[in-house]
Amino acid sequence: MTHEDIVRSLLTYLRSVTACPDLAYDEAPTRMSGGFDATILRFSLQSAPDPFSGPLVLRLFQATATADRAPREGAVQNALAQLGYPAPSVFVAEARIEPLGGPFLIMERMPGRIVGSELENLSIKGLGQTLNILRQLPRIRREVLRLWDEAQTRLHAVPVKGFVDLVASAGVPPENLSFDSVFAAQRAFVEEFGLSGLRPAVDWLTANTPRQSTAVICHGDFHSSNVLADNGRLTGVIDWVKATIAEPAFDYGAVMAILATVPIRVPAGVHRMLRAMMNNLARTHSRQCGTTPETEAALRYYQVFNCLVQLVTVGKSHAQGNTTQGAYNSPVGVANLVNHVHLLTGLNLTLPG
């Protein structure tokens, strides 16, 4: 669908859902940043009934998304919101692809802006603005760490049983959120899509399971771009596709892998410095997880797992002929992941050409 098709079809869908045939947009849908595997639009409606009366977000997945994706994310976010965590409440979790060309969520739009959003200017502004931001990095770093740590600590403190009960009551089997289930899905994808060059990572992860600590609710993609704040106050955490019940190192290891590997577009002179700063941020943030040898082994393990997930995502995309550009869907992105796994394990991974 084109953007215009989505805008028109969304309004038709909402008129049906609300039984308001004259429903109209107050703020027409416009694209928001992020969402490498989804189209994200912000909008609002005129004189709409609750719960559609406030600022809204459409999160539209690709047609190839699994049938359980929208219900799963909706159940996760609503359970967290009901337990007092700042996840956006979901008002519609549509599994069918017919209305908009893919499954989708309609949810509340959280106030605030992305934590550390000033860093985005490094990739879109000139050298003068870049140097100005570099002078502000110590302040930005302190603010990012404070809000990031708060969001992470609060999530890991959410009672797992209460969360599991709410997710189950929404019709989502809680066992589907376990790390074992998530890992099994990655193993299956490797075989289904002929990604034999990733089997060494699967074998390594199977043979090197770390000593387990108490399971908590994990986000799975908890970099600061998924954390929102307003005037120094945490207001929201978004993008729950990788939510998993696992030990805390699952989240911290994922962040370490992401900040070590995600491609960054910056002037050549600041690339190395920015990468070092990102790695330092991740390492500092991960200290909340502990510094014992067992913790270090777990962080290493979940870094490798996160890289495997990213590589599988790229491999699936290529196998399905999907040209949508994701964060790692480039030669540089794949090379960063492969090199990081080699650094951690000595393995040499490959993806089909």
Labelled PLM ranges:
Residues 163-182, 298, 302, 313-315, ...:
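C-terminal/domain-terminus segments
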Residues 59-60, 91-92, 217-220, 237-238, ...:
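Short beta-strand segments
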Residues 28-180, 184-197:
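ATP-binding pocket architecture of kinase catalytic cores
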Residues 1-25:
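Juxta-kinase regulatory segment immediately upstream of eukaryotic protein kinase catalytic domains
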